[in-house]
């Protein structure tokens, strides 16, 4: 009876303890500090994606076999009233419903309504410190809709029927007199509208006073179709100022009428240059289209000569643009205009233009704008995806920097490196979100963050690194990226403090991609995956999951731990050096280094180990060391005493606590290794069939029990060892001829060393 009870107890101990380790080997570990907040289950949990792939969006991250998106083609006219800052226009929108759903109404954006005194966006502008709204200007803002008609054509006869519509803040719902059928039906809607431009319109549009006349930078100027997609149907989030735009693709045909002394530049290609430029300007324009160097089309002297002249006549400028999501323009009598040829990888050409006042001229300022524009477009075209527009125009305005397809508005006072930075950034937006049409209103990091990331690469390339930035010290950025009051990057800009937008939408996502490229995937794998994402979703509407899935599938890595740490959560990183000990207390036999992950974020481990002779060895451990551990020990095959060990020596990870990153022989302790030779051997119990074998590897005592996987134990006292994972303790006698295996801190099973 006693023997049966003993065998049952031993079996129970093994079943409850050691069997929990089946199919996994526990690595060498040090005692886990109770202060660690790290949970490897949280970091590496399965099922990151809340839904499977669909017929429209593949689980691999590419558009599905049945992917669809709707289309909006625009015929637009605009007349500029310079005195009143008023734009009067018409828009004929051909909207094509490619969705599987029928429609009885459509939604449009009327974004100028942000500047209505009663708008929601105006109501939430703080008393001070905001870039949004009209900066306190009191004026009659907002779109004035004169009429909305549905246009039909039957046997050559055109009919216009008034449509019922309702305006709700910055959205307009138009009821269709006839239901729009699914999968290819279209409707033509004609809208007459006008509005007065704000002087400063949420830093995205405005009017700048210069000594030679006003500069009009015109955007969000016509009613634009909302996106109807497979994610949430109509996307009708209001324009509140902080979040930007989500728009359908289509072709544009635009006629802009302005005072005859104005130069007008636009997103598209000018198709009537002979009607608006004089013979000299036409000749210079032709030269610019074939020149790698900047060519003046309209000079500063010519601007000054015609400055502030009273003009009663007008010119109409005609522009066309294909497969774009928006169209913006600028107009002024104050514009100096210069240009140069853009060379694209396919052999096609585009045209770089710069329009700026004399106050901005000079080689230290906007005189280099076209050079910057050309370099930026050529770089991104070669590296990621070819530029798709016939013109790239940089306009000096009173915006800090704002992007539209083929045209950007940058600060008129910018110079040198600042001008390069804002020019390169705004033109980078022609890839994100102009070519890759993500939902800016919800996920600003998918355009601002991606763009800031590619800017870091182009700046390193430009003019042999003229404006190359130093490598980011991520230790210094760690607190900024992860402070407790910071929202997550997945938040909409409308759902975060305005002061946090720069961090969460620009710098943190950009930094995440830098870390992913340089420390996790490597440049080659990252660049292929990122380029594939651009190619797959060019002129389409990706979601965050489409990006995450593409990066994983092309790179061949499960990156859920990375997305969780950086994007979904606001997790901190704190890796630290735990203990150092020489194998058998002999520096010639190597050193065992133990590192610990103290906080929620998991990242790879990089250490520099410097020996007494001055030799430095770099050690890299993959992130998988944290996949089932809070603490990790490894052996470094050094042959002499260690002088210092530095964790993350390049400050390449956002480690929030540098205090535990450096160990030096002068200040740090070396843990004495327990000489394990006396414990090694095979142990038996004459009342049980199991044998227990103790072996040593790299200074770690390992335990093998018959028919059970090996595990390791750590010392917890004199001749006393424990495996917390197995739930077992081993108390050796002083002569080390045997031990008691302790189960549940109470039951003892004696074993004796075999002779």
Walk through the language-model features, giving the residues of each:
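Beta/coil-rich, acidic/histidine-enriched accessory regions frequently appended to metallopeptidases
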Residues: 83, 536-672, 692-693
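Short, hydrophobic/aromatic-enriched beta-strand segments in well-ordered soluble domains
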Residues: 91-93, 97, 108-112, 185-199, ...
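A surface-exposed beta-strand-loop module
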Residues: 26-37, 86, 96, 102, ...
């Amino acid at each position: 009876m006693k023997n049966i009870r003993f065998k049952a107890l031993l079996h129970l101990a093994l079943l409850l303890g050691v069997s929990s380790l089946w199919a996994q080997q526990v690595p060498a570990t040090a005692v886990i500090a109770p202060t660690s907040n790290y949970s490897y289950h949280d970091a590496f949990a399965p099922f990151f994606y809340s839904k499977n792939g669909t017929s429209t969006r593949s689980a691999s991250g590419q558009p599905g076999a049945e992917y669809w998106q709707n289309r909006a083609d625009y015929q637009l006219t605009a007349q500029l009233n310079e005195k009143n800052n008023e734009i009067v226009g018409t828009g004929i929108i051909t909207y094509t419903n490619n969705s599987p759903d029928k429609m009885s109404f459509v939604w449009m954006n009327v974004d100028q309504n942000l500047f209505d005194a009663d708008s929601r966006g105006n109501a939430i502008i703080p008393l001070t410190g905001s870039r949004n709204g009209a900066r306190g200007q009191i004026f009659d803002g907002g779109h004035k809709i004169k009429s909305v008609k549905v246009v039909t054509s039957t046997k050559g006869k055109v009919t216009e029927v008034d449509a019922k519509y309702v305006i709700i803040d910055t959205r307009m719902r138009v009821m269709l007199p006839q239901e729009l059928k699914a999968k290819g039906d279209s409707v033509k809607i004609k809208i007459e509208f006008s509005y007065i431009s704000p002087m400063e319109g949420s830093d995205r549009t405005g009017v700048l006073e210069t000594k030679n006349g006003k500069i009009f930078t015109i955007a969000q100027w016509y009613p634009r179709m909302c996106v109807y997609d497979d994610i949430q149907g109509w996307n009708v989030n209001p324009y509140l100022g902080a979040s930007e735009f989500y728009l359908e693709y289509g072709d544009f045909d635009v006629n802009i009428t302005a005072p005859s002394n104005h130069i007008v530049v636009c997103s598209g290609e000018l198709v009537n240059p002979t009607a608006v430029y004089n013979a000299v300007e036409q000749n210079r324009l032709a030269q610019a289209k074939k020149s790698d160097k900047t060519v003046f089309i309209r000079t500063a002297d010519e601007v000054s000569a015609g400055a502030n002249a009273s003009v009663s006549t007008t010119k109409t400028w005609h522009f066309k643009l294909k497969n774009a999501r928006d169209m913006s323009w600028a107009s002024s009598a104050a514009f100096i205009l210069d240009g140069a040829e853009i060379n694209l990888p396919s052999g096609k050409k585009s045209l770089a233009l710069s329009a700026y006042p004399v106050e901005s001229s000079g080689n230290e300022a906007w005189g280099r704008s076209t050079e910057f524009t050309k370099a930026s477009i050529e770089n991104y075209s070669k590296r990621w995806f070819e530029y798709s527009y016939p013109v790239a125009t940089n306009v000096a305005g009173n915006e800090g920097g704002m992007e539209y397809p083929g045209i950007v508005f940058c600060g008129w006072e910018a110079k040198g490196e600042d001008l390069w930075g804002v020019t390169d950034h705004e033109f980078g937006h022609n890839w994100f979100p102009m070519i890759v049409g993500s939902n800016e209103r919800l996920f600003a990091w998918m355009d601002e963050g991606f763009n800031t990331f590619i800017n870091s690469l182009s700046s390193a390339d430009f003019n042999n690194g003229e404006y190359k930035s130093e490598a980011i010290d991520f230790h210094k950025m760690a607190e900024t990226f992860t402070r407790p009051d910071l929202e997550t990057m997945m938040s909409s800009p409308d759902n975060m403090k305005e002061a946090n937008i720069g961090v969460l939408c620009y710098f943190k996502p950009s930094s995440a991609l830098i870390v992913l490229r340089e420390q996790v995937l490597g440049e080659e794998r990252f660049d292929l995956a990122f380029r594939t994402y651009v190619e797959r979703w060019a002129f389409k509407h990706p979601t965050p999951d489409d990006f995450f899935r593409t990066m994983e599938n092309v790179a061949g890595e499960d990156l859920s731990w990375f997305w969780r740490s950086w994007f979904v959560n606001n997790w901190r990183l704190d890796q630290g050096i735990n203990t150092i000990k020489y194998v058998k207390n002999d520096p010639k036999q190597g050193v065992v280094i133990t590192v610990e992950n103290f906080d929620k974020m998991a990242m790879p481990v990089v250490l520099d180990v410097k020996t007494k002779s001055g030799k430095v060895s770099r050690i890299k451990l993959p992130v998988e060391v944290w996949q089932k551990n809070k603490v990790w020990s490894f052996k470094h095959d050094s042959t002499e005493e260690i002088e210092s060990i530095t964790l993350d020596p390049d400050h390449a990870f956002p480690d929030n606590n540098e205090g535990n990153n450096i160990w030096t022989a002068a200040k740090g302790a070396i843990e004495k290794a327990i000489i394990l030779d006396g414990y090694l051997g095979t142990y038996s119990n004459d009342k049980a069939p199991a044998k227990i074998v103790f072996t040593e590897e790299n200074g770690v005592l390992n335990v093998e029990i018959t028919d059970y996987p090996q595990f390791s134990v750590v010392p917890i006292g004199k001749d006393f060892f424990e495996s917390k994972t197995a739930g077992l303790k081993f108390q050796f006698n002083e002569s080390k001829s045997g031990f008691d295996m302790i189960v549940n801190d109470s039951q003892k099973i004696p074993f004796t060393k075999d002779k």
